[in-house]
Amino acid sequence: AANAVWNYSLVEGQRAFLVFNPLFDNYYGYDVGIKPERIYPFLTKSVEELTDENEEEFADHPAYLENMWIAGGYLNVIFNQKLPTTHKHRVSLVKKAGEPDIADDGYIHLEYRYNTYGDTLDVFNPSVGVVCYNLNTLPLEEAKGIKLKINEAYYGERILSFENMNEPTPDDAKELHSIARLEVE
């Protein structure tokens, strides 16, 4: 049977949303055999180092964050953004240079950064985006969890705590099959 997944190349470590139809139970030793229908690759990035020299590049503009959770060694973020008019926007997960991997409180301290590159957010026609950050460079097993500093458009600056490093996928994240392709890097 044909499927709609054509001209897609797998990329090691890239996260994606797969829409499929189950075909068979207990298929050659697997739980189920499937027919892929669509695949939506997500922007997949690593944790970056924040220094005095590159702080302006990461910026810290308010972001429209919808949901965040950690699973499979990734911090997964669902966000809304205005479609860029001139430059791709930049979303980043950063760790301050020179700080220990695990702080005195037992947590890994990170920051979510957003750079609009001067685009205004006054005319807001939101589009949903997803970014997944690979956390494999961090000592997750040795830490109590992650404390994440965010700058939300609705609530301002906050710190979120994540103790569960393998959360179930939120229900709203299971409905991303209509996601638009955003211009972010």
Pin down the residues of each PLM region.
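Short, solvent-exposed, Trp/other aromatic-anchored flexible loops in extracytoplasmic proteins
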Residues: 9-14, 115-146, 153
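Short helix-loop boundary/capping segments
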Residues: 63-119
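N-terminal post-signal-peptidase region of extra-cytosolic proteins
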Residues: 2-6
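Short beta-strand elements
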Residues: 154-184
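Short acidic/polar inter-strand loop motif in beta-rich domains
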Residues: 21-30, 140, 150-160
